[in-house]
Each structure stands twice: as C-alpha cells, then as structure tokens.
C-alpha cells in the first residue's frame, strides 16, 4: 500500500513523497526546490530513491540540481524528454510504463499535452499525479497546447477508475470553487464539497488528494458535456454552443479572465 505525503512549498505548491508503507525508500514528484524535500527525508529517516517530473516549469523542476548536489549526483530523475528538462537522467520518450525499483509498483505514463506539450501524468496504483493538468475543481492554463489537446487530456484522465485519487501540484481548490460556483451555482455536489474544503483549509488541512469521482461531479472542466455547463457558458458569452470543445474553450477563457 502506498503512503503519500504532501510537502507544502512556495505559496501553494505540493511536492509529493511516495513510498510503500513498509519501506523507507521514497520518491518525490515535482520538487520545485530541494531543501524542504531534504529536510523531510532526513526528519523521517527515509532514503530518497528518485525523482519523478511531470513537466518543465520551474516550480516543478527547480529542486533537481539541489537534490543531485546533496546526493552527489546519484539520484535517478525520470521525466518527459520532450520537455527538455535539465537534470533528467532517465528520459521518457514513448514508454507507457515505468518501473521504479524501490516502489514495487508499475507506473503508468499518461501523456497529457495542453498545459505544456510534453506534460505527463503518472498513475501509480490508484494515485494520479497529474501536475498542472487537472486540479481539484479546475484545470491548468493552456500555455503551449491547444484547447482540443487539453480537453483530450482531461477526458483521458476522467476515464480512469472513479476511485482514483487526484494528486495535483497546487492548492488551488478554493479559488477554483469560487469560479465553479459562478458557472454552476446550484450544483448540490459542488455546494457540499465547497463546505468541506472551506473547513479543511480553515484547519490548515490540504484539500488534496481529491477523488476522481468527486471531480466528475463538481469540476466544470470535466462536465463540459453537460447541459448545465453548456447553458452557463452560452449565457456568459451570449452565443450558441455547438459542441463540447466549444464549451471547454470558452469555459477556459472565462476562467482565465475570472
């Protein structure tokens, strides 16, 4: 069974420490800075076995060099070759599975272009490490890809088993809820989730992970096929909506300017 722990960093990032419950070998996902990771590993008597990277942005890769310096360049660092990330030792090109030696679990590699063109998500048992593609009640900005690519990537993640947990890289949930309530103010699932998140954050508890089943019920970016979201988008932009891609494209534009 996996044990997954969040290391908070910067204003709203989470670096995820992943290990088997009975093992002291651990991996870290998207370390944007080295020292909090080193501090956690030492404080919990763990051995850092490697680094897993979803995409190239600095708040996800900025800690690679510091970790290699501390561990004398002995760390394997896995990440997408297409992202051109300095410090990657094991480039992922066309592979769809990855074996992390000390994790005793197969890692499914899921290409999710949109936020960046080479962005990957990783499915480990029932945990989805999706970087900046899917957030709780939201999705990432489209910096390099197209709306069609991002929608396809989100659809791919949405098709995974509903019991999977979403380990995204940022604590954006409350701000995403504020937007979602503007889009679908009468969604009872969203209202209930908003109440839970507000209490958790007031107690300084992470809102993550979220369950995919929850996201399918509350996340407007995963519900662009629904009448409720289509109608809201059509009203906001005073236009006729013809398909799901148009809904998603305009919804993302709405959020960008929210």
UniProtKB/Swiss-Prot annotation:
Cofactor binding notes: Binds 2 Zn(2+) ions per subunit.
One GO molecular-function entry: metal ion binding
Family indicated by similarity: Belongs to the metallo-beta-lactamase superfamily. Glyoxalase II family.
Cited InterPro entries: Clx_II_MBL, Glyoxalase_II_hydrolase, HAGH_C, Hydroxyacylglutathione_Hdrlase, Metallo-B-lactamas, RibonucZ/Hydroxyglut_hydro
Name recorded for this polypeptide: Hydroxyacylglutathione hydrolase
HAMAP family in alphabetical order: Glyoxalase_2
One GO term of the biological process aspect: methylglyoxal catabolic process to D-lactate via S-lactoyl-glutathione
Top EC group: hydrolase
Sequence positions that bind Zn(2+) 1: 55, 57, 115, 132
Pathway noted in the entry: Secondary metabolite metabolism; methylglyoxal degradation; (R)-lactate from methylglyoxal: step 2/2
Species annotation: Shewanella denitrificans (strain OS217 / ATCC BAA-1090 / DSM 15013)
E.C. code: 3.1.2.6
Annotated catalysed reactions: an S-(2-hydroxyacyl)glutathione + H2O = a 2-hydroxy carboxylate + glutathione + H(+)
Cofactor: Zn(2+)
């Amino acid at each position: 069974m996996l044990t997954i722990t969040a290391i908070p960093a910067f204003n709203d990032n989470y670096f995820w420490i992943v290990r088997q419950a009975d093992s002291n070998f651990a991996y870290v996902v998207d370390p944007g800075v080295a020292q909090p990771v080193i501090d956690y590993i030492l404080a919990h008597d763990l051995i850092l076995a490697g680094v897993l990277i979803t995409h190239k942005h600095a708040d996800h890769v900025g800690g690679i060099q510091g970790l290699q310096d501390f561990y004398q360049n002995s760390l394997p660092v896995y990440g997408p070759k297409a992202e051109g990330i300095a410090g990657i030792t094991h480039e992922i090109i066309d592979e769809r599975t990855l074996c992390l030696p000390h994790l005793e679990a197969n890692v499914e590699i899921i290409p999710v272009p949109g936020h960046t063109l080479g962005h990957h998500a990783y499915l480990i048992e029932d945990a989805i490490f999706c970087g900046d593609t899917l957030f709780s009640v939201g999705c990432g900005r489209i910096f390099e890809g197209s709306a069609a690519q991002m929608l396809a990537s989100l659809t791919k993640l949405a098709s995974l088993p509903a019991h999977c947990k979403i380990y995204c890289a940022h604590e954006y949930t409350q701000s995403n809820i504020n937007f979602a309530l503007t889009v679908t103010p009468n969604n009872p699932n969203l209202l209930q989730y908003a109440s839970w998140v507000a209490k958790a954050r007031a107690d300084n508890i992470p809102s993550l992970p979220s369950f995919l089943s929850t996201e399918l019920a509350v996340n407007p970016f995963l519900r662009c096929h629904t009448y409720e979201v289509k109608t809201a988008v059509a009203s906001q932009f005073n236009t006729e909506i013809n398909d799901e891609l148009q809904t998603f494209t305009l919804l993302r534009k709405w959020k960008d300017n929210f």
